[in-house]
Amino acid sequence: DVSASGNFGTKDQFKRELATEIAAILAFSAIKNNDKVGVIFFTDKVEEFIPPKKGKKHILRIIREVLAFQPSRKKTDISEALEYFNSVIKRRSICFILSDFISAPFEKPLRIASKKHDLVALRIHDRRESSLPNVGLVPIQDAETEEMIFIDTSNKKIRLDFVKNRLDKINAVKKLLPNVGVDLIDISTGNDYIKPLINFFKGRGKKR
């Protein structure tokens, strides 16, 4: 997910920077296992697709693209990426979806993909996205639509409504993913992401 909502962060790094680091680690791990690796960059459309291949040269190309990629659009539509993935990847694969999952509905293509492939959702988020500090009247701009509104954060009801709306969306995603057989890893900016990844894969190894 290379949409504009990734350009948010309040503790040392943006969400997109965190996603980039994780994508690079996952790609490097494929070298050791001699796995094929591909990548789909998406916003509200598929921006670029690098088909799966083996080899260090190919992996390094993917990492260069991940580090330097500049999307042409700002919005997010995960369903577009999933539909494209379903159409171009025929063999059963492990698919890591790195996104904040702030998107238009995507349940239908997710269900289709999860029946054929092994999906892992890495929800990249920042803790400040789920809170609104009491600092008076502040401008808030949607990174994807560029719409700007002013919010009176001194109003307790407004702060509570903001938090509730945000948590409702997060909980909806957390409920949907396991219901369709998709594993979820929650990773926040400013926190160690190596340990959650290691714990996740260790847990998977035990299940198998």
Features from the language model and the residues they span:
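An amphipathic, basic-hydrophobic helix/alpha-beta surface used to engage anionic
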Residues: V2-P52, Y84, I94-F96, A104, ...
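Short amphipathic alpha-helical interaction patches enriched in hydrophobic/aromatic residues
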Residues: G6, T10, V66-Q70, G181-L184
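Von Willebrand factor
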Residues: K57-S93, P105-F106, D126-R127
